[in-house]
Amino acid sequence: MQKRGLQHFLKKEDLFGKINNMVNIKDILSNYKNIALVGASKDLNKTSTIVMKYLQNYGYKVYPVNPTIIGQVILGERVYGKVSEIDGPVDIVDVFRPSDEAIEIVNDAIKINVKVLWLQLNIKNSEAKKIAEANNIIYIEDKCTKIEIEKYLN
């Protein structure tokens, strides 16, 4: 049996600024299956595209978001300009953009009542975190969805 530490649990105080509840990344990835991937690229060698393909292969519905290639197709999915323009349900906003863009992204995501704002590895933004918390959006930063799936769902 594989020994796991508690690193897969994040205190909700880290996500919402509240105490006493735990948010389990495994539960998030198991229960939320609709993902807006912000920073999607047509370049198949880019990390965002590799992760998008992985998520699709794992059964997630992934909506690529990139305002420079609106209407084009990445891995069989039409590209949107903003999260709020997506015409299907979105649970998780997975961000592959610089930290300073996170505020604009979370403000847009609020419009469609997303459940999770997930900033990829090396992406952090304290103001985006505050905005997410104020709107009861689970905030995760500096973590890769692909890596977390490999840890907890395989």
Write out the residue ranges for each language-model feature.
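Cationic, low-complexity basic patches in intrinsically disordered or flexible, solvent-exposed regions
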Residues: 4, 8
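NAD(P)-binding Rossmann-fold cofactor-contacting core
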Residues: 45-46, 53-73
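Mid-chain, well-packed structural core segment of small domains
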Residues: 83-123
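Rossmann-fold NAD(P)-binding glycine/threonine-rich loop
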Residues: 121-148
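A charged, well-structured terminal subsegment
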Residues: 148-154
